[in-house]
Amino acid sequence: MKLKNRVIIFLSSFLIFTSLLICSAGAVIGIQEEINQFPGFSGVLIKDLNTQEVLFSHNEDKLFTPASLTKIFTLLAALETLGKEYTYPTSFYFSSTAPGEVNGNLYVAGSGDPTQSLEVIRKIADTLVQKCNIKHISGDIVLDNSKFLPEEFLGRGWMWDDKNPLIGALTVMGYEVKEKQNSYLKTMPLLWGNFFSQELSKKGLKIDGSIRIGKTQEGLKVKYIYYSDTLDKILAYMMKKSDNQTAENIFRTLVPEDNPDGVSTIARAIASLEEVIDTTLSLKWGKDYILVDGCGLSEYNLMTPAHLIKAISYLYQKYDFKILDYFASTKESGTLRERLPFQVWGKTGTLSSASAMAGLLQTKNKRWVVFCLMENNFISIEDENDPKIFENRIIEYIYENL
């Protein structure tokens, strides 16, 4: 009887193993057929999340324009450099000799907080008036935008005629460039200042001067500091909504605060990112990959599917399944909502001739896999050659067969 049971167990295990092999073989054949039919240049890497076994690979070490998959590297670098509890301060300086009076200018020093929507600016104005009991400003509202270089309001390699986010130490969340302007350098901080002054005026506060850009006067003590939400929440928003303004401001914030002149330049942000990626992933900037922004709008960016898998796997090893909280999901809001009929967590990327998707899913066979799909050099048309349809079909093969 014992022998009979052993035989049954052996045969059952053999049949299960054989069926898994057949399913895996079917997935490989199906994925390869999709790749053969796709009219552009594609790269695919699929691994078992826990064992790191390669389940399928194609051009996994070739360089691609990653589009918004760049944000995965921004996520990793921000967590490693700044930490989940980091907050952006916006500081207010002025001198006062009488209750309710600001003698001279009110200075507002930004740090690149990407979360300041109109509602947040209203909240800041409310708190400032109540906390400091301000009724009158005899001078100007001076906007200190010096944390970032004014000439770096756009990223390197961005298409100048696209709708790009404006980057600055003082930014209004959700505002993008609608058309070509020669006043880019001052647009964003002045936009912030106009909304802020309007909210102050609504509360009966009188402003004698104007709104202008300048540096905070030395010797003044800070009177009030507004702190943003924690970086943990900001990163989740950046990833799920694929928000370019948020990603680029975070990228510029990677620069250590103790740098010589306190300015977060693009070159310094690249150097900070380079150091983190070298330390965590052992990848060399300029040799293995190139990234010059944090959002993925740059056509200069280059990385491979293997790089993205390495980054996601590192995040999983360090944060376990908590990393799923950062990714968009087919069952929740975000760029993947309802894209597929089963649960997938991931990051999408789209430019005019680049599409990509990377993430994690649990297959029907209860196997956790990490995947990266990248496509370049195609003519984007909404038919059977649409790269998003190509990606969906491959992910369906993964879910059904691996």
Language-model segments: what does each one mean?
Residues 50-51, 62-65, 98-99, 112-116, ...:
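Solvent-exposed loop/turn segments at secondary-structure junctions
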Residues 52, 66-84, 141, 195-200, ...:
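Active-site SXXK
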